[in-house]
Amino acid sequence: MRINKEKRIGQVLFIVEGSSTEFNYLYKIFCGLLGYSYVAKKRNTPDYYVKDSDPYSRVAVVNTRESNIRDISENPKYLDEVFDVLRERYHFPVEQSAIYYLFDRDPESNTNIELIEKYIKILANPYDNEDGEQAGQLLLSYPSIESFIVSNFIDETINLYFGLGKEVKNYIGKINRFSLIKFLIKR
């Protein structure tokens, strides 16, 4: 994998379900490695974290109110309020941003198949969707951030098997997950 540190990305908004891992990895990649500007809002914390670096490449990371995919539509008021703050206080143009929903999918979480199918259909484009209401692309994996790390930065992954997302999370924790990001930054 080759990373182009000179590429400008404009504005990108990540909506995640987790409250720690996703924020840490996205920060390490977009701020530590690429030097982009960053705004983060975690649920259950009143403050926003901001790092201004590159005005042409800005990333915002927020999570849903609850750690479950159904919260995308069950609690839209929470995300609407967060989006309002991003627009007004941080001048982050939510409507002109690429929006990605990063959610896990394993046998013990996000098990409502009908709801997942609905989101896959309506959250299909990071900029605009058919319904004209809700932009964003759902990136559903097992678990999403950890799958990215394992598949890109660990050798011989074909020999690994994990039944649940928490198993892969524990595996990454044992091999010091941030050493993987430090390795990337040195490249």
Model-derived segments and their meaning:
Residues 18-23:
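Short acidic, Gly/Ser-rich segments with clustered Asp/Glu that frequently serve as metal-coordination loops
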Residues 1-9, 24-187:
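C-terminal accessory helical subdomains adjacent to catalytic cores in phosphodiester-
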Residues 12-17:
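Short, hydrophobic/glycine-enriched beta-strand segments
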